[in-house]
């Protein structure tokens, strides 16, 4: 990237997460958790006290410390950069904030072609704080891989069009159906922003990336293919030259797994609504799977957690027999805020034995 030096990518000699993601045989079953750095950890709550979410995301030292917390506590096999999917939008100059108890709120929703054409682009220097956070982490993590991430164009579009979180995505779908030309222009802009954000992280040294399409489960397979897939596919194509594993995840996307696999990622994330065995059939051979414990199971006591973890490991082994390239144990969504962190630590130890 112009004006930014590229960090020499680390050589990690024993990284089970990277092995599973690339079709090699890991030394143990790798495990990490979406939202592992967050409100379930008392040390996180203490560190974030009085500091806004977006403010935290633009403080390199804070980003580094928060990202490291679950590595120290749980011994997971990968770190995921502490950030938020709207960070590149905020960095580019879009007026938005993350409101406690609500989520991202956009001051001026995007509703017309003029609104789309007025959207800013993301310049590398605008995410310099994130880049510095990545560099600090690369130095701090030792042999633990670092996953960078971004929100997928569709999910970012939904926030911009709706003005915030939405249950039914009615304004988003209305634009899709009534004005597909404007829709694709909007997603083109957001795809450029997503690529720029991921490229900045890759140039700074992340070892893998995950694209979060949080709201894609609101779409039918036909609509996903027509209105979303080409843009997500472009994201994965544009960053392929970095040579790191690319993960694709959405919530409620069981019916979309085949299409999501076609987008070009190396790993497809699976939520708890579809077994890993069935996911392997839908995604097809040659791609690793990630998931898929229901986060609510962590509230059900140690026997239930162990039973479900063993079931998932067995389903994953069947998925491997069907042609899946690997398995990375994870939840089917993020860690819930009231989760007992001790349960997560015990789960990591169990998964490493399975």
From Swiss-Prot:
Pathway: Porphyrin-containing compound metabolism; protoporphyrin-IX biosynthesis; coproporphyrinogen-III from 5-aminolevulinate: step 4/4
Enzyme class (EC, first level): lyase
CDD domains xref list: URO-D
EC number(s) from the headed UniProt entry: 4.1.1.37
SUPFAM superfamilies attached to this UniProt entry: UROD/MetE-like
GO CC, any one term: cytosol
A single MF term (Gene Ontology): uroporphyrinogen decarboxylase activity
Binding site residues for substrate: 35-39, 84, 159, 214, 333
Catalytic activity: uroporphyrinogen III + 4 H(+) = coproporphyrinogen III + 4 CO2
The family this protein is said to belong to: Belongs to the uroporphyrinogen decarboxylase family.
PANTHER family: METHYLTETRAHYDROFOLATE:HOMOCYSTEINE METHYLTRANSFERASE RELATED, UROPORPHYRINOGEN DECARBOXYLASE
Subunit structure: Homodimer.
UniProt function note: Catalyzes the decarboxylation of four acetate groups of uroporphyrinogen-III to yield coproporphyrinogen-III.
Protein's name according to its UniProt entry: Uroporphyrinogen decarboxylase
Originating organism: Nocardia farcinica (strain IFM 10152)
Gene name of this polypeptide: hemE
């Amino acid at each position: 990237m112009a004006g930014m030096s590229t960090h020499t990518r680390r050589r990690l000699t024993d990284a089970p997460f990277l092995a599973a993601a690339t079709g090699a045989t890991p030394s143990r079953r790798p495990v990490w958790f979406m939202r592992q750095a967050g409100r379930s950890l008392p040390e996180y709550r203490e560190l974030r006290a009085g500091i806004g979410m977006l403010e935290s995301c633009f403080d390199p030292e804070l980003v580094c410390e928060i990202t490291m917390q679950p590595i120290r506590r749980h011994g997971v096999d990968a770190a995921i950069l502490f950030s938020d999917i709207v960070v590149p939008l905020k960095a580019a100059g879009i007026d938005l904030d993350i409101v406690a108890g609500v989520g991202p709120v956009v001051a001026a929703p995007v509703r017309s072609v003029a609104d789309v054409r007025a959207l800013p682009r993301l310049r590398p220097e605008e995410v310099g704080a994130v880049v510095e956070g990545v560099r600090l982490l690369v130095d701090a993590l030792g042999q633990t891989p670092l996953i960078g991430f971004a929100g997928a164009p569709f999910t970012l579009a939904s926030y911009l069009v709706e003005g915030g979180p939405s249950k039914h995505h009615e304004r988003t779908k209305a634009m899709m159906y009534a004005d597909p030309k404007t829709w694709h222009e909007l997603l083109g802009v957001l795809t450029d922003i997503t690529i720029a954000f991921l490229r900045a992280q890759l140039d700074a040294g992340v070892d893998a990336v995950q694209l979060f399409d949080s709201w894609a489960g609101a779409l039918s397979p036909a609509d996903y293919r027509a209105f979303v897939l080409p843009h997500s596919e472009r994201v994965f194509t544009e960053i392929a030259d970095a040579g790191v594993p690319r993960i694709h995840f959405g919530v409620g996307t069981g019916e979309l797994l085949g299409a999501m696999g076609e987008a070009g990622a190396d790993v497809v994330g699976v939520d708890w609504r579809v077994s890993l065995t069935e996911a392997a059939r839908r995604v097809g051979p040659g791609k690793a799977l990630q998931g898929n414990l229901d986060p609510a199971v962590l509230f059900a006591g140690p026997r239930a957690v162990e039973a479900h973890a063993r079931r998932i490991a067995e389903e994953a082994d069947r998925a491997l027999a069907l042609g899946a390239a690997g398995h990375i144990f994870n939840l089917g969504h993020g860690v819930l805020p009231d989760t007992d962190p001790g349960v997560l630590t015990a789960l990591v130890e169990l998964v490493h034995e399975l």
